Amino acid sequence: MSFVFRYRARVFSPLLVVLSALGGCAYVTPEQPRAPALPVLAKPAPFTAADAEFVQTLNTMDLAQIALAKSATTQAGRSDIALLGATIAKDMAAVQARLAKVATVHTLSLTDKPAPAEQKRIAWVQRAHGAVFDRRYIRYFASAYARIKPVLARQVATGTDPTVVAIARDVQTRLADYQAAMR
């Protein structure tokens, strides 16, 4: 009996495999429906002339702040001003890098030096040391903050490029924190 069983298994096993394979070929799959067209990608927010002007204004302010903050680390009379200067230099350099990315994307050129009038004010502050430097630096920072504050607020309210608006918000909060720390 075992011989007969083995014989049947040898005959029927390949037969079952062939029949099941042929059965799978007999079924014709219906044609797949066509994929719908891809939706149009959302266009990036427009980069307006106001955005470009803001990026350039913030760039010149950042350059001046970085130059004076680096001076504050060595010339400040108070240690808190020196530490704050190091923080401002690091943070504004990061903002500068973000502005450079935005400028590259939108083919905008940024200056690498502050305006000549700002350079004179920076040189005037940098000539001092100790407590005199602290007073001049705090006064300069307060006046620069007063000048840039409405520009930042306007950009946050009316800016069209979300990256530029995010930079404006970030700088707005950082400058307010620095101003509070200097008092």
Question: What spans do the regions from the language model cover?
Answer:
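Sec-dependent bacterial lipoprotein signal peptides
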Residues: M1-C25
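His/Met- and acidic-residue-enriched segments that coordinate or traffic transition-metal cofactors
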Residues: F3-V4, C25-R183
